[in-house]
């Protein structure tokens, strides 16, 4: 296990997990719920992040060009090999209507070095 911290405290995260503290917190909020978000929803989050990274790169909004390239590469890799990473997106389907936990989960997995 690795320890991660945020403004709410410290959580243990499995060492090999691509997700992080926000995902652990979201899963802990609904421990008895076994159904997770539909895989197509998660893939669409990845597609939106990919499109946003490209659009902002084209618009010159990044101070460091490595950032959008890393986001694009990660999103493409996750989409191309989704079955390998599907367990990393284990946010309970009942998590609140805003999708914040799903968004944070996807951000954590995209940001993780592969």
Where are these regions (language model features)?
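Conserved, well-structured ligand/cofactor-binding cores
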Residues: 1-114
